[in-house]
Amino acid sequence: MTIPGSKGEILTNEICKACSVRSVALFKDLDLEVFDRFHSAIREVEIGKGDHLYNIGDTGERVYTIRKGIIKLVQYLPDGTQRIVRLLKQGDLAGIEATTGSTYQHDAIALTTIDTCAIPLKTVEMLATEQPQLHKTLLSKWEDALSTSDSWLTRLSTGPSRYRVIRLLIWLAENTSE
């Protein structure tokens, strides 16, 4: 299967080990020898501004570590109105719901050019059985996603629009390097 936006490049061991988001990525705690065995399954995927990384209802076959850029996760109201439910930034994990066997629950749309590492779920599942620390890291990623969602609900979806925009700009300034 072709990965949308894939450069078709397998990231080398050296690139992965020196990656700027390695310290916060899903596989941050893996032993280097374990890392050496599986890294060839990861593909670099670049998506242009406005393009979709995945869509609501698609079968979740991969999770994506965001290396650069911002992705908005959107859902739709019954009348078709788009609602941004979360923004993902460098170091975040997109498509995490796929780890439960679920389809993707959002449209993931690039707000900027994004660079990601596409990690097959089969790789995540295989490593989770032999590397217990991966389970803890995955739970931590879930907790981060839940905290971010809570923050969006309390800070960015209530109050006058002027204040919501200000809070969004503050969030962007604090959470992005772009």
Model-found features: residue ranges?
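Cyclic nucleotide-binding regulatory module and flanking cytosolic helices
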Residues: T2-G48, L93-A94, A98-G101, E130
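Conserved short-loop catalytic and cofactor-binding motifs
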Residues: R22, G57, L153
